[in-house]
């Protein structure tokens, strides 16, 4: 199975944690279609931890909790598929999941076969309760082999939180996406920390094995399982801009049944999503090496010759950020310029021929442009 674009979808953990059931999943599937998320590219609906009973069945298989999922997981998968969506589930490389439910250690091939029988299309694979003598590369390779031999295409989302320098070995496991960070929390400090953690590993991002900066918190506003304080709408926009420019998977974590209009517009911004989903999937690169002044300028070369540039003010004070043609790599003697479009305002903002300075960016604000190289 080859995955050419960063996966997009919804995951239950950020908002609901253990408070999941069949009704929630069915309603979320309905809204993913009715509210335009599927059309925008969000195709995976993923149930995270806490979906099973505390003990395996007599046949050794994991048993879905009959109170939460009275019709079983095959019925849930069938409903999700009937909406044109793909269905995802969760397990762990240890003996227990992070919440203490049965996990897949030494049951990898059985669990992969079970997931395939249920119609699972996506597996998030966490990193809790593994034996001390075991190492992450072997355990993730083992599940990678099990999924590759289960008879069904199942996207493998490896979630070991960036431990053991996983960026150096994760591709060998067969993972299609890999968590490079610890868990995100719904506050600005967490978003900023996850951004800063990318400065030394950006070059390991690549098509088919995508650097996952964790699920989106856009629209949570402090509510739910990881809702520790919440963010402002502007901070959510910065969060979404960086994840998209970086090419991270976009997995929504809010309750999409209750998200407000502003955050729905963020999540459904087709121009920003197009940057994340660019078919060339070239690595982004930092133009200012994360300056000590707290600003970040990051660029990504896109299919067809365009470039995307993000300006990020991570400080607590207003900032204006500069960009020159030379920063991008266009020499002044080339006779070329850069026609720029603001992807949040959806408007052309002029042509860069020398130096561009952003409008004043409020604390934690950002600007994302798409540039087209033109003759002067």
Label each region the model flagged.
Residues 336-356:
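Solvent-exposed beta-strand/loop surfaces of large extracellular or lumenal domains
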Residues 1-23, 31:
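N-terminal module-boundary/linker segments of secreted carbohydrate-active enzymes
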Residues 352-376:
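C-terminal beta-strand-rich structural cap/linker in extracellular carbohydrate-active enzymes
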Residues 7-12, 41-47, 86-91, 121-126, ...:
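Structural recognition of the beta-strand scaffold that forms the well-ordered cores
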Residues 107, 138, 149, 155-255, ...:
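Glycan-recognition surfaces
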Residues 243-246, 251-253, 290-332:
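Carbohydrate-binding surface patches
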Residues 28-132:
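Aromatic-lined carbohydrate-binding/catalytic grooves of carbohydrate-active enzymes
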């Amino acid at each position: 199975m080859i995955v050419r674009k960063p996966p997009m979808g919804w995951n239950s953990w950020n908002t609901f944690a253990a408070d999941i059931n069949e009704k929630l999943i069915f309603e979320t599937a309905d809204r993913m279609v009715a509210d335009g998320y599927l059309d925008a590219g969000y195709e995976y609906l993923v149930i995270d931890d806490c979906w099973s009973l505390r003990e395996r069945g007599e046949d050794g298989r994991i048993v879905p909790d009959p109170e939460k999922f009275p019709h079983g997981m095959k019925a849930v998968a069938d409903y999700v598929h009937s909406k044109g969506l793909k269905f995802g589930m969760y397990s762990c490389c240890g003996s227990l999941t992070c919440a203490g439910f049965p996990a897949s250690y030494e049951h990898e091939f059985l669990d992969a076969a079970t997931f395939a029988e249920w119609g699972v299309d996506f597996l998030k694979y966490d990193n809790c309760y593994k034996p001390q003598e075991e190492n992450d590369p072997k355990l993730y390779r083992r599940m990678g082999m099990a999924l590759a031999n289960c008879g069904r295409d199942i996207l493998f989302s490896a979630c070991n939180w960036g431990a053991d320098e996983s960026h150096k070995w994760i591709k060998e496991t067969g993972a299609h996406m890999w968590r490079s960070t610890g868990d995100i929390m719904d506050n600005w400090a967490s978003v900023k920390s996850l951004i800063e953690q990318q400065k030394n590993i950006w070059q390991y991002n690549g098509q088919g094995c995508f650097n996952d900066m964790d699920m989106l918190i856009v629209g949570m506003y402090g509510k739910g399982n990881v809702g520790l304080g919440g963010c402002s709408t502007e901070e959510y926009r910065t969060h979404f801009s960086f994840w998209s420019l970086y090419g991270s998977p976009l997995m929504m974590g809010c309750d999409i049944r209750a998200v407000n209009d502003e955050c729905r517009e963020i999540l459904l911004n087709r121009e920003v999503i197009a940057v994340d989903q660019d078919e060339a999937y070239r690595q982004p690169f930092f133009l200012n090496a994360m300056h000590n002044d707290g600003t970040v300028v990051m660029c990504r070369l896109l299919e067809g010759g365009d470039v995307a540039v993000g300006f990020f003010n991570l400080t607590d004070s207003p900032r204006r950020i500069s960009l020159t043609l030379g920063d991008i790599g266009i020499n002044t003697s080339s006779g070329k310029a850069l026609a720029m479009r603001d992807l949040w305002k959806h408007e052309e903002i002029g042509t860069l021929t020398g130096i561009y300075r952003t409008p004043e960016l409020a604390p934690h604000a950002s600007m994302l442009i798409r540039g087209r190289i033109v003759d002067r």
